[in-house]
Amino acid sequence: MECSSFEAICNESEMIAHLQSLFWSSSDADPCFGSSSFSLISSEGYDTMTTEFVNSSTNVCFDYQDDSFVSAEETTIGNKRKVQMDTENELMTNRSKEVRTKMSVSKACKHSVSAESSQSYYAKNRRQRINERLRILQELIPNGTKVDISTMLEEAIQYVKFLHLQIKLLSSDEMWMYAPLAFDSGNNRLYQNSLSQE
């Protein structure tokens, strides 16, 4: 009989502890709370055993309640941290994109600067070669140093045409005797052009 009442008391104290854990906050819990049948038992060993059981179960209950409150707070804090971490991640992502963009722009600028410098180097060399050729051409053309570049180029074109005509006349069997006349007329025309420019 004592066994069955002991089991009933244990079951009842477990239920009480469970109900305390569900409904009461830690300040409202009373570890000595029990049923009337629990208070009627007066055996010291049994009483200390059940009191320890009730105390341990309520402590478990309080721990459970504290854990539930902490987890709710942690959830709130976790959500705040999650939002904060999300915004920080977005900021870091944006910053890394900006850094990548700046790096690619700077690389492109360096590449374009080097390309521009190489292009300017080639353009400078090209201009130097053109100027050298123009000086040589000025020396070959009669009165080429006395006129501007555009006039000198026109005279050079006329002079080249004259030279082609001379080649044709000298290479043909019938017209070779007229070559000196063509030379004189071509030469006179160049001379007249240079006089008109001065």
From Swiss-Prot:
Annotated segments matching region Basic motif: 114-127
Keywords recorded for this protein, A-Z: DNA-binding, Nucleus, Stress response, Transcription, Transcription regulation
Localization per record: Nucleus
Induction annotation: Strongly induced by iron deficiency in roots. Slightly induced in shoots.
One function term, GO molecular function aspect: DNA-binding transcription factor activity, RNA polymerase II-specific
Start and end residues of each bHLH domain: 114-163
Disulfide bonds: none
Signal peptide: none
Gene Ontology CC annotations of this record: nucleus
Major location (coarse): nucleus
Span list, region Helix-loop-helix motif: 128-163
GO biological process, one term: regulation of transcription by RNA polymerase II
Lineage top rank: taxon: Eukaryota
Other comments on record: Plants overexpressing BHLH133 are hypersensitive to iron deficiency.
Role summary: Transcription factor that acts as a regulator of iron homeostasis. May act as negative regulator of iron transportation from root to shoot. Does not seem to be involved in the suppression of the induction of iron deficiency responsive genes.
Name of the protein: Transcription factor BHLH133
